[in-house]
């Protein structure tokens, strides 16, 4: 952000919220590829290699204006020849510029809102694992969850209208309309299952910004309703720096939505309602009765259709009882289980037994979906039998071993919060034997002969990685390490879901 402020201070257009001229500043595209900036935005750095030259950008924008999009039919939308042979490369260049520039006013506004406010900015809240301690604390006391699939697709104009309320540069928005045409005809919806996958992979940063801007409208309603119904006003939410920049937003939402919601229905006034969004879905957990949860369900459908003009269907919202249903959440299976215990109590000469059955959130590794991910990645077959990785047979022995160990270590790291860690032994076994078969195939040998040659140390390296990592953090006592390894450990440095754990 300091880079942005240094570049933008001498620019006169900053005073008038003009973003369009920034598209012709080459340092914008250099910043998009910078190591530090991309690490902050959680995207993989691909290096700045002068492909984003100012001349290329000017030519692309000129051709966008000269192209007649009214002549494109629905059948020709997939054969858009505007970008020619290097369509993916050039569209990525433009989308990176769009994404970097449109984030500037939001980031500057956010930083200015924190000035003078004594707020601790916690970057640890970026971790995926930071949500699980919250769920462990809250879900056992609730009864029902509403699994909501956020409605798709959405028309292009709705995205533009969402940005128009916050971005004042008409030229920038006009060019953005032209750019979005290459992904979908203006007369159809923007996102189908196939097109959203292509768009998000080729333009991840731009897609995330458009997606979050769109979803933020829904979450604004939840924030407003929650603030109105809760006795404890949401005034300390500014610590969620990377999530929604909620601080100093509450008063604005109260003014905006007060006219739309002059009377809050009684069934919405629930101080025990909790909301979590992930991977195009969201969870509403509550202590309400099934009748009130059904009212919530149809209220959400009407809200989307009437207030946001997005088509939805009640079938996209499922109400489940926590005690009978498992949540497929961030690659984990989570369910609320009873943990019965019997305590003998004695008062004077009388003794009696007290049966206690507190609820506990049980978080386990989904073995079958995880094996399916390994099979899709060609580490094993559909039955879970390890196979050799052909694409890595041309690497050196050290590189092959190091890559398999890194995959195994990352999975162990990601699933460290599981209450049943022994289930990970099967996954480690598949990766270990796949590594052995890959090396044996490279050396034109059998897996048994190769294992006999390298010895048992090779086997143990896959299974002791997590324990060795914990020994670097805590005192090296066998009791402490054994207790930590068997218990749940949530790490605050996991900022994206593991590729093999993503079963979507």
UniProtKB/Swiss-Prot annotation:
GO BP terms, alphabetized: mRNA processing; RNA splicing; tRNA processing
Cellular component GO terms held in the UniProt record: chloroplast
Entry's localization field: Plastid, Chloroplast
GO MF entries: RNA binding
Pfam families in alphabetical order: Intron_maturas2 (PF01348), MatK_N (PF01824)
Keywords in alphabetical order: Chloroplast, mRNA processing, Plastid, RNA-binding, tRNA processing
Broad class of where this protein is predominantly found: plastid
Family statement drawn from the similarity comment of this UniProt entry: Belongs to the intron maturase 2 family. MatK subfamily.
Role summary: Usually encoded in the trnK tRNA gene intron. Probably assists in splicing its own and other chloroplast group II introns.
Name the record gives this protein: Maturase K
Naturally occurring in which organism (per UniProt): Fagus hayatae
